[in-house]
């Protein structure tokens, strides 16, 4: 089963889609938009084109596990996604994904504008990889 993960942001939203078996990240993209409706419509288009059957969305949590200050904004966007796509997003803990994405890009000599254009897609890939690992470890 294909799964899509997103790293929602004010100006850029990273997208990662698994391979057909749901084992690893297959493709990534970045949606450039400051308008939640436009972002949600683009996610819907990508869901349809990819055939993804599940949507995972990074959700902000503090290091102690409580909801972060932007949680209500993310919940509102998740509700908008469900309304537009007909698919309820799974809210997935995104703690440290952007930090890890920056580290990965630094180690691979991505700097400046090149890094800015890639960090959201890498963060979405990390969200997806975390979710896929969870599924592998919790098979019934």
Regions from the PLM with identified roles:
Residues 2-3, 10-140:
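Phosphate- and other anionic-substrate recognition elements at nucleic-acid/protein interfaces
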């Amino acid at each position: 089963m294909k799964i899509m993960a997103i790293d929602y942001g004010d100006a850029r939203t990273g997208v990662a889609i698994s391979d057909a078996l749901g084992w690893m990240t297959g493709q990534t993209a970045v949606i450039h938009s400051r308008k939640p409706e436009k972002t949600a419509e683009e996610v819907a288009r990508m869901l349809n084109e990819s055939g993804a059957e599940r949507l995972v969305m990074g959700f902000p949590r503090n290091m102690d596990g409580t909801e972060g200050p932007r949680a209500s904004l993310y919940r509102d966007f998740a509700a908008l996604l469900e309304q537009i796509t007909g698919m309820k997003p799974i809210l997935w803990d995104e703690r440290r994904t952007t930090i890890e994405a920056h580290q990965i890009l630094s180690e691979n000599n991505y700097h400046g504008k090149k890094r800015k254009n890639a960090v959201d897609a890498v963060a979405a890939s990390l969200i997806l990889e975390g979710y896929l690992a969870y599924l592998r470890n919790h098979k019934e």
